[in-house]
């Protein structure tokens, strides 16, 4: 097995990862594992003094419980979702229609996970408890790496909520009033692309909203502020 990696990219960005490099602490070599890496992070071991120390891996237990359920739900055709949601998911995942505007798997999985938590039948979420601070609003977080298209996912989340609310006004799971709180003026300026009527908005630029739903997006109220 190699001590260094000569082929870093081993998965397609448009498909669920199928393999990963794993560092074996005993052999001090990298091993190619034929499965997706479980969610987790690495932190320095207590008392570590060497830069060569590989650190301690901490698994994200909740994420690893949710991932297979979302995958099964996806494979079953997203049961429990509204007709609007089904159309959006089909539009986002149809690679034949999207051509050069294909979305990354990380983006699709991020939006799927939020939708699954909100729309999937209750039995799908048995045993899943997301910690809360007890406030009026439940906080959900999709952690994504730099460069994976977080702003595009925000556009997907907004369109999903707005289009469902406009279509089903009595459904309290959705809203067409969106508040985005940005850290700093630069980020606030960059997020103007999330306002549907703005020039070069992401709903058009990245083909987030199907043509049949474009007019409905005008009923949204998107406000971007600094904290």
PLM ranges: what are they?
Residues 1-227:
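RecA-like P-loop NTPase motor core of helicase/translocase proteins
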